[in-house]
């Protein structure tokens, strides 16, 4: 029962991540969010697998239908086909899952059912509980991971291979230093884009800084780095307090998952401004600037990003004279590998497969 509950918890974590990106994709397709849809190639490729018609239709119309299909798999209440599994899972695997009776109805349904059957006096059969555990696993994979990946590439474009200095020694002195921490890309995309504009470069210089530098903590760091040149990955969630302890960060922008409350205690020691952006993840003592519970202010994404950037500029001014120590530990990393970037680099997967077979 506890294992099933843990699986349901993991499903909701990644399912919530997928939900926000899918809401953003649908909003952008319906002109309710002023963000360009950059992943046309990804959208048109995936739509073929889902049998979504394209001929004579605009990119936004096709993107809207794709978002609807993925949202339906997230939240379907009536039993029906899990379309992402049908479209993207190998046929032999689907047959095995069907025979085992572990095909999910939807991400919402499997999390809901997992908590229902593991409550007092309900499912006492370990095999039945393990079936639900596996249903949660499939919903986690095909909505929490696959759908989230499709929607991210569809809205923000596919990241490319990049080479960068990483680790704690990559921190820079003299800049307005902003860390983005978490998993949700919509608001982060605008913070990074607007923060790199000439307008905000001039604002930073006006307060004596060399510019604005972004750093990635956890998954937001890597996701942002693939797409925006001015983001340096520093560490995973476990290293967050160590990074704050350098005294180099002016502002810490956190959304959801892997954001531990202890960062507030360390940030307070160095006057680092902490801003939360998700209604689902508040921190005591942090300022909250983000979407409301119903996402009624999604259209205000750029205004929210500007407000956060302005807070970072204010924090930089207030922190002048704060002792900073940056340990000299950094390495060069190459990141941003994907099937598409691999094919673009090698022409196909054949050279890579041959190298693996030849143990090269």
What are these regions (language model features)?
Residues 1-360:
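Metallocofactor- and cofactor-centric catalytic cores in central/energy metabolism, strongly enriched
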């Amino acid at each position: 029962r506890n294992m099933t509950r843990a699986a349901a918890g993991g499903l909701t974590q990644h399912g919530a991540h997928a939900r926000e990106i899918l809401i953003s994709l649908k909003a952008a397709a319906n002109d309710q969010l002023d963000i360009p849809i950059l992943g046309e190639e990804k959208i048109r490729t995936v739509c073929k697998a889902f049998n979504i018609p394209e001929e004579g239709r605009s990119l936004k119309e096709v993107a809207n239908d794709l978002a609807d299909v993925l949202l339906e798999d997230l939240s379907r209440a009536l039993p029906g086909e899990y379309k992402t599994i049908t479209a993207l899972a190998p046929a032999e695997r689907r047959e095995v899952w069907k025979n085992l009776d572990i095909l999910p109805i939807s991400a919402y349904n499997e999390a809901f059912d997992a908590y229902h059957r593991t409550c007092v006096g309900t499912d006492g059969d370990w095999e039945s509980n393990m079936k639900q555990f596996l249903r949660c696993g499939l919903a986690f994979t095909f909505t929490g991971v696959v759908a989230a990946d499709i929607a991210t590439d569809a809205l923000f474009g596919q990241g490319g291979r990049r080479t960068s200095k990483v680790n704690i020694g990559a921190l820079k002195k003299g800049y307005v230093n902003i860390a983005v921490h978490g998993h949700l890309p919509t608001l982060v995309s605008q913070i990074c884009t607007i923060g790199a504009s000439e307008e905000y470069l001039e604002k930073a210089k006006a307060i004596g800084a060399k510019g604005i530098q972004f750093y990635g903590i956890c998954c937001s760091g890597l996701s942002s780095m693939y797409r925006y040149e001015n983001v340096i990955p520093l560490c995973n969630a476990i290293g967050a307090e160590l990074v704050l302890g350098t005294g180099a960060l002016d502002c810490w922008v956190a959304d959801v998952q892997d954001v531990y409350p202890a960062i507030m205690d360390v940030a307070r020691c160095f006057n680092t401004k902490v801003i939360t952006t998700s209604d689902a993840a508040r921190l005591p003592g942090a300022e909250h600037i983000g979407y409301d519970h119903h996402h009624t202010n999604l259209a205000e994404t750029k205004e929210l990003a500007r407000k956060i950037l302005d807070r970072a500029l204010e924090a930089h001014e207030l922190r002048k004279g704060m002792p900073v120590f940056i340990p000299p530990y950094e390495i060069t990393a190459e990141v941003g590998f994907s099937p598409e970037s691999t094919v673009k680099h090698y022409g196909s997967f054949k050279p890579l497969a041959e190298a693996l077979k030849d143990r090269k």
